[in-house]
């Protein structure tokens, strides 16, 4: 039996990784995982609580373990956290264990998609746009570094983007 390939979705907050990932997994008959949801299941607490109690460093440690564990599976679609690429170990795991798809979006779209979401600790500030711009400056080159495929998600439905990914991957 042929080995099933993994698809890892990377990109900023609000790019649509979780929504697109669910569509993609369903269309390809693969298992879907979301690293943030997995962290919440393992800790029994939401991401905001983990950030409050353990800080970003504690969250990133948990995230690295979850992604290391999940990326060892075969035949999954994994939606990663936006900041996961800041870890060289995570970038190496993703690159070595599957196809990395960078879901690219503009800051304007990120702001629009995340403005009412209170579950994003890094955006609970007076100027979330500034935070998103600063994060993009740091993270976008890292997404590009490990991406096998780059897909723009602005002004397209999750299903259309999932179809584009399938087409680009030749599945």
UniProtKB/Swiss-Prot annotation:
It is an enzyme of class 2 (transferase). Its cofactor is Mg(2+). InterPro entries: P-loop_NTPase, Shikimate/glucono_kinase, Shikimate_kinase/TSH1, Shikimate_kinase_CS. Transmembrane segments: none annotated. It comes from the Bacteria. The keyword Oxidoreductase does not apply. It is found in: Cytoplasm. SUPFAM superfamilies: P-loop containing nucleoside triphosphate hydrolases. One of its GO terms (cellular component) is cytosol. ATP binds at residues 14-19, 120, 156. Monomer. Catalyzes the specific phosphorylation of the 3-hydroxyl group of shikimic acid using ATP as a cosubstrate. This is Shikimate kinase. The gene is aroK.
């Amino acid at each position: 039996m042929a080995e099933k390939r993994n698809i890892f979705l990377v990109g900023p907050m609000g790019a649509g990784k979780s929504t697109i990932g669910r569509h993609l997994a369903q269309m390809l008959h693969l298992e879907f995982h979301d690293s943030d949801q997995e962290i919440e299941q393992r800790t029994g607490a939401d991401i905001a609580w983990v950030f409050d109690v353990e800080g970003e460093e504690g969250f990133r440690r948990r995230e690295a373990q979850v992604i290391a564990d999940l990326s060892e599976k075969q035949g999954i679609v994994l939606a990663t956290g936006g900041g996961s690429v800041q870890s060289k170990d995570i970038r190496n795991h993703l690159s070595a264990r599957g196809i990395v798809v960078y879901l690219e979006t503009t800051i304007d779209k990120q702001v629009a998609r995340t403005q009412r979401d209170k579950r994003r600790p890094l955006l609970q500030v007076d100027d979330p746009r500034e935070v998103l711009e600063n994060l993009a400056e740091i993270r976008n080159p890292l997404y590009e570094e490990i991406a096998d495929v780059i897909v723009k998600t602005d002004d397209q439905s999750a299903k259309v983007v999932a179809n584009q990914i399938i087409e680009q991957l030749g599945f």
